[in-house]
Amino acid sequence: MNILILSASTGGGHMRASKAIENYMIQQGENINVEIVDSLLYISPILNKTITSGYLYLATKTPKLYGKLYDLTNKEHKLANFVARLNNIFANKLMPLIEDFKPDVIITTHPFPTEMVSRLKVKGEINIPLICIMTDYAPHKAWISKDIDAYIVSNDDMVGKMVNEGVN
């Protein structure tokens, strides 16, 4: 079984979660092949550096601004729509990876690749089960996308919140 784990190195928790999933899956059997890919780095090293350094700067130097941007992207707003459009554009750049690796399932631990893979499914470009591991403690609109086959959340309190966001 080929398992593709897509994440991003904004902060540290998303990639650590990916590594923990990889370790667990490998222990489950001999015929399991796991590939972890930093989706932003794969798409563009420049994009990766811009987003990760921007995130680090905002989170550490201007946390109030980071909080404001976080809130704006969690509702219908021009910024949230802009990020969604970018993810739609970048989604196609994941296709060579998906075609080469031929995953039986795709697991995501970051909202950007979650939305990208979801877009590929919506457009009918792939028909691969997509599992989203939400590494945050509360749902954010960036994590909620169409055609996600399963969500795994960090705590029971999130289940009701996810239902309120339209996830069934």
Predicted region positions:
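Short His-centered aromatic/hydrophobic patch
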Residues: 109-112
